Amino acid sequence: MRARYRACILSLLVPLALQGQDIGLLRLNPETGGRGKADVYGGYEAGGYHPAFAPASLWKAGASAQGTRHGERTSFTGSFSFEQIDGKEQFTSMFLEPGYFPVDVLEFTPGDKTRQTYKLGGGFATTFAEEFVFGVKADYTAANYAKRKDIRHTTYGMDLQVEPTVAVVGDNGVGLSAAYIFRKRTETIDAEQVGAATDQSYFAFLDKGMRYGTYQVWDGDGIHLDEAGVGVFPVKEFTHGFSYLVEAPMFAGGMSLLWKHGSVGEKGYDWFRYPGFSWKVFLEGRFKGGHSLRLDLNLQNDQLEESVLDKVTAGGITTPTVYAWNAVSDRNWGSLDLTYAVRFLNGPLKLLRAVLHGGLWDEKSYLMYPYEDQTTRYNGMATLVAAFGFGPVDLNLRVNGGAGAWKDQGLSGGSDAVDSVPFRLTPDWLRKMEYFSTTKAGAGLTLTYHLPFVRGLYVQAEGTWLHGFGIDLLPGADRWSSTVKVGYDF
């Protein structure tokens, strides 16, 4: 049991370099037979220090299972998980992951929201010609996100990623792999109003970047939630790219380069489109005495364009026609992480890890010519993790702290010939910036007890706390969570 725990701890030192691309290296020193785990959990989270889209409080429950089996020449891996989250007093973004897409749709009536997420993963790697390995890994996520208070909405999401990989595995523990990456991600917002329409109709906001956009009745033409001929707000995104990974006993390194193209709309009603790219690279050195040092660099970009679209009617048939595309916003962001870790094979202290994180964002809005605006923001965070083992009890302690800053250029480029300025949802933007930039400190504790009478069975309790300093606009200065889990390693 302790050896198994130690193996789990040591795996923390070598996190997956590039999501999914480890499949080709399954054949690098494979264990005999294989291993797996399964767990169920439940938790609660509350507190006022949270982004506007997050709930005031939530309950969650879930289950997961994963396993890996090794044969003489082929290895298989698979996983499944389900999670349900019930949030209270939740509003603003209707998307599953606010901020991921360059557009957003916001509503303003707090209510209960339910999110269900299903994840499936699987893959295989097989050896041929002694040192060569071919593998394929696929990860699929399906989710739905529903609110049952006007304006009601159900958001459906699908995310599929497939990575065929070719690797070379040497007898000296060195592995090289290259993978092609394909990803398709879609989300569809289906909104409706059940209650009777009144003079106080429900409004929504279509964010086209930096909280500049359109604010009107939710089913108006400018929001696109209930456009004739479409009826929903669909987003689809395709990503292609490649990645490389080098794995050795004392060194690891990798790189991925991805290009994406997304669009908003369907059936000829193409309201927006956005190209983008991401570049990730990491380097890790492993030294004597269990020490390791890792550097992660991540750069991303996307550019949002809005169509000049008209509905042309001929012979009683209406056809949407796109005449041109106008740039309305672009985003550039990056992060740099430096991780130092050391493992201990003797004594109660098993792992010590320190992470320094820095992030930089640059956003521009060109929603209404000749105006433009720009925001630059950056943040830094330091995290310290210590893992202990005391017989059947494992203890994980985490502390972190950080701060950020931002600068808004303000609208520029106007002239006397322009009477109006682009609309901005300023209060929500300021709350977003306050959550991002405030000085914060947090802590976490995870306690795991391995039951002695059933090998592999454990019970785990976890608690976290986060505090923001100098809060002015957010509902509170603290956020806390607790989770209880029962699991089995096999």
Q: Which residues make up each language-model segment?
A:
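Membrane-proximal, glycine/serine-rich, low-complexity loop/turn segments characteristic
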Residues: 21-118, 123-132, 167-174, 292-294
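Outer-membrane beta-barrel translocator domains and adjoining extracellular loop/strand segments
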Residues: 26-28, 48-55, 89-95, 146-153, ...
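Transmembrane beta-strands of outer-membrane beta-barrel pores
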Residues: 42-48, 82-86, 140-144, 180-186, ...
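Outer-membrane beta-barrel channels and translocator barrels
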Residues: 70-72, 127-131, 169-171, 239, ...
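Short, flexible helix-coil linker/hinge segments at the edges of structured domains or between repeats
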Residues: 92-104, 180-233, 259-268, 311-318
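Long, internal scaffold/assembly segments composed of regular secondary structure
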Residues: 215-356
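Outer-membrane beta-barrel "beta-signal"
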Residues: 478-490
